[in-house]
Amino acid sequence: MNITPKIGVLATLLFVNANLFAQETPFKLGVRLGGGMSVTTGLDKILVPEDYYSNYNFKDKWQFTPTVSVFAQYHVDGSIIGVEGGFSYWQKASQLVYNDDKELNYKVTPRYNYIGVSALLKIYPWRKGFNISIGGRAGANLNGKGISYESNQEDNKFANYHFATVAETERLMKEKLTGQPDIAVGGGFGYEIGNHWALDLRYYHGLNSTIKTERNDYNWAEHSTHGQNIELSISYLFKL
């Protein structure tokens, strides 16, 4: 019995199988950890909507924020186009600092947590490695009352003004200035290192207001407040 043809067929099948397994799968799952800076502008126009007085100034300060994502990526090896989508946790934060010529100062710090979805189109100019991403994300606000307040308004030199306590002012802000869901467009640059690691630098700009002003008796007005996030992250990707 001639077994040579059978051995040849078996060897061919093994060779084809080895080639199939060696091919790079276009689907990958990834875990991303990162941090960045965030700011929300327009809060000053909520608190002081008109020129009631002068000799004061506001300043918006960026705040550190974390981000975590679980995502899926599709990119055929050698292709210019890829896509990415997943679930993310992120924060939007900012700090508004007030000072005036009476030496009154306060800090208002909104910090909101979000869980949502993201989708990005990725362009690989050199077909691998470096990529440009364009897309957006949308998420639910987990802590709509996530605003804090600090001030020296309880100092004796302001006794004649009969200011509310710091605790009461913060309570009112939590009640009347509520955090909203986040819908943002964004994009950035990334670089994939080998088969498993990736670095990304991305920017997101909020399309809707971060804070909604509820009806109140404190002259706080409704005004658009758009958040911005800059995030640097590292990812680990798993082949499927």
Model-derived regions, located:
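Sec/Tat signal peptide C-region and signal peptidase I cleavage site
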Residues: 18-22
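Bacterial N-terminal signal peptides that target proteins for export
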Residues: 1-9
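Repeated loop/turn-to-beta-strand initiation elements of outer-membrane beta-barrel proteins
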Residues: 79-83, 129-130, 195-201, 240
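Short glycine/proline- and aromatic-enriched beta-strand/turn motifs that initiate or cap beta-hairpins
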Residues: 23-75, 154, 167, 237-240
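Residues that define the transmembrane beta-barrel architecture of outer-membrane proteins
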Residues: 25-27, 62-66, 111-115, 179-185, ...
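Residues on the lipid-exposed face of transmembrane beta-strands in outer-membrane beta-barrel proteins
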Residues: 31-37, 66-74, 87-89, 117-123, ...
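Outer-membrane beta-barrel "beta-signal"
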Residues: 226-240
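Flexible, solvent-exposed loop segments that connect beta-strands
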Residues: 43-59, 92-112, 142-178, 210-224
